[in-house]
Structure formats: structure tokens, C-alpha cells
Amino acid sequence: MLDQAFEALKTFDFGTPLSDVQAIDDAAVAAHDDAEVRRDLEQRLIAALGLDISRDAKDYVCRKLALVGAAAAVPALASLLSSEENSHLARHALERIPGPEAADALASAATNLSGKLQIGAIGSLGVRGETNAVETLTSLLKERDAMVVRSAALSLGSIGGNESAQA
């Protein structure tokens, strides 16, 4: 059943009956009680992101990685951060994946991207409450782009703490 659901992802869009991918949803639920199921599902979802799948399928995969993803998923998600069409999908997952790898990917995007993509990455650091990003966010307060400065200030406020307040 799971193999069939992943096969259905290759042609998935939001008009596809959700029953076609129900086995993936079921595996995501089962993954909370079984580390082996979680790792297997995570690897399959990562592999799916590497395929030529629709934006809707990438959205679905990123939502599942937000539930079951760990450090192994970060490189695949980070590769989407520079895409206008997919950045927010990846950020949604990276905001929820615990660990420094996800935070580092977002911090890198916050300093290396520009425009809306950069602002989104900055905001995601605030959503995570990423105290390790305070130095990065503080440095962005000196940028010329007022929206970058505003986003960095808002994220620092979301993170809170003495170090953020002193920035």
C-alpha cells in the first residue's frame, strides 16, 4: 500500500483523491510510536522531493516531513529555500524539525538569500525561537533593506531573552 501511495505522488495534485496517498498519512501517524517507521518514511519522502513531482506533491511531502522529518531531511528541504515557488513549503517543515541542522539551514538562507526569500528565512528563525540565531539576526539589523531589518527585529522579539533585547 505504501509503495502504491508513493507511486501516486508522482502524479499527485490537490485534485487527486486523498485515498491515493492515505497510506502515507497512516505511516506518518504510525511513525510517532515507531522510530524505524519514521526513518523509513522520512527517507521515502526525501527521495520523493528529488523526483520531478508537481508543486502540490512537494507541498504534501513537505507537510509530512514537518511531522516526521529529522536532520536527514534538512539538505533536501534546504535545497528548496532558494525557490520562489517552494521556499515557504520547505520553511514550514524546517520550522518544525528539531535540531541545529534545520536552524543552520535557515540561518544560512537568512544571510545568503535576498528579497522575500530572505525575509521568509529570517521569519522562520523567529518562529523556531532559535536562540542560536540571535547573532545572525543582530547582524541583519544593519542591512540597508528596511524589510530585512524589520523582519530581523521581529524575529529577535519572537525569540526573546536578554541577548535579543540588547540587539
Residues of each region from the PLM?
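Structural detector for internal amphipathic alpha-helices that build alpha-solenoid repeat scaffolds
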Residues: 14-36, 47-51, 55-70, 76-79, ...
